[in-house]
Amino acid sequence: MVNLAAMVWRRLLRKRWVLALVFGLSLVYFLSSTFKQEERAVRDRNLLQVHDHNQPIPWKVQFNLGNSSRPSNQCRNSIQGKHLITDELGYVCERKDLLVNGCCNVNVPSTKQYCCDGCWPNGCCSAYEYCVSCCLQPNKQLLLERFLNRAAVAFQNLFMAVEDHFELCLAKCRTSSQSVQHENTYRDPIAKYCYGESPPELFPA
């Protein structure tokens, strides 16, 4: 029976339409996975997207993390960190302490909210996750609004594509051109993730 099944399978593989079908399904799966992973990056790069500039950014999150174990409470987070993760409520935690709802486990001692570890007074930080967490402090709202008002039109379109305070901090810390000295050189190779208005000091060449 096994030999018969193997023989039938080999005969099927010799047919071009079967190979084409297998290849097509594999290609669809690959493209679907790629598009899901790149969805946020594509939106950040869409400089030509049209938005209503009179619509204010909603700075308040829609739920309170007071009981983060509630299944109805879902958190977006910074996703890509290998060791650290920042959720949309400003908590930084180790990846292993991330709950299934996407929120950091606030009962773990190492989890910190609005953490500015490794961040300089100019708003530049040594780690992307700390940059986002520090940027999410409520008192940073005026600074971020001032930045948006001063941004060039094309640059402003990029940041107006975000929907709230969390997405603005994700984009600001990830795409800040102020931290670049030359094409492939950071002004400060240590504190290169910036949410603030002032660029880092020039690093000696």
Curated annotation (Swiss-Prot):
Subunit structure: Interacts with SCAP.
Family to which this protein belongs: Belongs to the SPRING family.
Main location: Golgi
Cytoplasmic topology ranges: 1-16
Transmembrane segments: 17-35
Keywords: Glycoprotein, Golgi apparatus, Membrane, Transmembrane, Transmembrane helix
Lineage start: Eukaryota, Metazoa, Chordata, Craniata, Vertebrata
InterPro entries given in the database record: SPRING1
Keyword Transmembrane attributed: yes
Record topological domains on the Lumenal side: 36-205
Name under which the protein is recorded: SREBP regulating gene protein
